Amino acid sequence: MSRSSRVLGFGHHAPSRKVENPEIENRLGLEPGWIERRTGIRSRFWATDQDTLSGLATQAGDMALANAGIDRSDIGLLLLATSTPDHLLPPSAPLVAHKLGLGRAGAVDLTGACAGFIYALMFADGFTRLHGKASLVIAANILSRRINPAERASSVLFADAAGALVIGACEDPDLGILGASVDSDGSRYGLIQIPAGGSSIPFHDDLDLGQTRMTMTDGREVFAKAVEMMTDCSTSALAVAGVRPQDIDRFVPHQANARIFDAVGRNLGIADEAIVKTIAEYGNSSAATIPLSLSLAHRAAPFRPGEKVLLAAAGAGLSGGAIVVGI
């Protein structure tokens, strides 16, 4: 029988500082309720001075490993999806693996922005199927340190959090990734970006610090393209899996904006009550939102054997994807 994979454990972590909308609305001169009406966000968590990206990731990974109940020596690979590593060099994943005591695991960062967890989960699934070894997939971001406080678009949306899944080998073809679809559109490369800090605009003495902060040039186009990409990828992934939208037990979308994932749900014909929504309390932590939402959903109502779950994301790059998972 050919080898498959399955989800063994869930984990998540958010910093201790909770930031309510009035704090941001007052700073930006926005009327009360403006943020929630346009995004669905009521609060978000931001890192304290003591928090690090590797620290948040380690907390989520530790929870997922405990939830999975497996020996840490059984983990063969750690993938860390992040846009805000501790340093530009070296990657943060080896440090996280060290903190978690994963003495026999490879570890590497993936920079896929909001879709990073989708790609990381696909790669981990392939590794586990090939080698029969468990994988730990973590997505984590500290976006509050990249927010431009003068730019409304980024100030109201972004948050800090981490989420994690443990993936293990199995021989049940109805478990693990049943179908997947990915996409990109580099013609919209500049819609969401941090302009400086890479090799195109390197750090220098006269650098405007504003160029090291997040910027969104056209929110309406981001909205339209995200809805389109998430809908198209989800439709393709469902077709590959041979699963109808109405047979999806839970739809766990990237929590970019409530209006985005509500539109995707309507496009797909997925009932609103099947959509997992965490954006109201946790905001948009980019790649971390999907594993965070999975872990929170599992804590509130544990996944039942046989559930089929749809994951979908789109974001900077533009890059996106969708996965159908059998739990």
Curated annotation (Swiss-Prot):
Pathway: Cofactor biosynthesis; biotin biosynthesis
Highest rank taxon of the organism: Bacteria
Catalysed reaction equations from the record: malonyl-[ACP] + an acyl-CoA + H(+) = a 3-oxoacyl-[ACP] + CO2 + CoA; glutaryl-CoA + malonyl-[ACP] + H(+) = 3-oxo-6-carboxyhexanoyl-[ACP] + CO2 + CoA
Gene Ontology biological-process entries: biotin biosynthetic process; fatty acid biosynthetic process; secondary metabolite biosynthetic process
Active-site residue numbers: C114, H254, N284
One Gene Ontology term of the molecular function aspect: 3-oxoacyl-[acyl-carrier-protein] synthase activity
Mutant lacking the gene: phenotype: Inactivation of the gene leads to biotin auxotrophy.
UniProt similarity note: Belongs to the thiolase-like superfamily. BioZ family.
Free-text function comment from the UniProt entry: Involved in the formation of the biotin precursor pimeloyl-ACP. Catalyzes the condensation of glutaryl-CoA, an intermediate in lysine degradation, with malonyl-ACP to produce 3-oxopimeloyl-ACP.
Protein name: 3-oxopimeloyl-[acyl-carrier-protein] synthase
Organism: Rhizobium loti
Gene this protein is translated from: bioZ
